[in-house]
Amino acid sequence: MLSRRGHRLSRFRKNKRRLRERLRQRIFFRDKVVPEAMEKPRVLVLTGAGISAESGIRTFRAADGLWEEHRVEDVATPEGFDRDPELVQAFYNARRRQLQQPEIQPNAAHLALAKLQDALGDRFLLVTQNIDNLHERAGNTNVIHMHGELLKVRCSQSGQVLDWTGDVTPEDKCHCCQFPAPLRPHVVWFGEMPLGMDEIYMALSMADVFIAIGTSGHVYPAAGFVHEAKLHGAHTVELNLEPSQVGNEFAEKYYGPASQVVPEFVEKLLEGL
């Protein structure tokens, strides 16, 4: 019997030809006419909570498995939302307000990745596990938020996604449907499929360089991206505060604060272009 990961990879590979044609419309996959642009590597970057920690974004989960003194099951699962939507909305309202405080700003690591995108243009793609918007605020534009976005909400009936910067209450409804439905945070909860997976696996199959930054290596499917990239011949790099659970999979490794190791590595990479 296939595992969930096995089913996902099987489905991806069956649709590979169709996906390749569709994904060429994304800037990461589009071939350029200018010869020198073709010589630049395709770089896929994965970021996790470690890149935003120095900006003041807390990583939520503590050593005891609690998120801000709440059980994960209560605030980060569909079942928890069904049981107590008011508690779940209050939890994410607090996170949303924190993200918009003036002291929360992109740090040197975010800015370095924006600089890397500027240099690589169409051949750069950023996949983040983070639900904040610090990459966009730093200047990155080609970003896949595989775990959703804190400053958006989703209609629980139609799935339509809406920009939302204020608090959400149980009384707030989506009016995109024939019958107004409750709004929920546009966040991937435990037990739900991450977003953009077909695009991500396609990008992994085409990347020349795969870089993981600030990730723990605990959470799948993201923890398996390095293995997938290696299967397709990508050079793999880990930039982290300490070795991740899958650190031995990487060909190149640098450890230290993200605001230090990421800019240093980006400069090294740019020198080689």
UniProtKB/Swiss-Prot annotation:
It is an enzyme of class 2 (transferase). Residues 20-272 form the Deacetylase sirtuin-type domain. NAD(+) binds at residues 48-67, 129-132, 214-216, 240-242, 258. Keywords: Cytoplasm, Metal-binding, NAD, Transferase, Zinc. Its EC number is 2.3.1.286. Substrate binds at Y92, R95. CDD domains: SIRT5_Af1_CobB (cd01412). It is found in: Cytoplasm. One of its GO terms (cellular component) is cytoplasm. Zn(2+) binds at C155, C174. GO terms for molecular function: histone deacetylase activity, NAD-dependent; NAD+ binding; NAD-dependent protein de-2-hydroxyisobutyrylase activity; protein-malonyllysine demalonylase activity; protein-succinyllysine desuccinylase activity; zinc ion binding. Its cofactor is Zn(2+). Transmembrane segments: none annotated. Gene3D superfamilies: SIR2/SIRT2 'Small Domain, TPP-binding domain. The active site is at H147. It catalyses: N(6)-acetyl-L-lysyl-[protein] + NAD(+) + H2O = 2''-O-acetyl-ADP-D-ribose + nicotinamide + L-lysyl-[protein]; N(6)-succinyl-L-lysyl-[protein] + NAD(+) + H2O = 2''-O-succinyl-ADP-D-ribose + nicotinamide + L-lysyl-[protein]; N(6)-(2-hydroxyisobutanoyl)-L-lysyl-[protein] + NAD(+) + H2O = 2''-O-(2-hydroxyisobutanoyl)-ADP-D-ribose + nicotinamide + L-lysyl-[protein]. Binds 1 zinc ion per subunit. SUPFAM superfamilies: DHS-like NAD/FAD-binding domain. 2 residues (Tyr-92 and Arg-95) present in a large hydrophobic pocket are probably involved in substrate specificity. They are important for desuccinylation activity, but dispensable for deacetylation activity. Belongs to the sirtuin family. Class III subfamily. NAD-dependent lysine deacetylase that specifically removes acetyl groups on target proteins. Also acts as a protein-lysine deacylase by mediating protein desuccinylation and de-2-hydroxyisobutyrylation. Modulates the activities of several proteins which are inactive in their acylated form. This is NAD-dependent protein deacylase. It comes from Shigella flexneri. The gene is cobB.
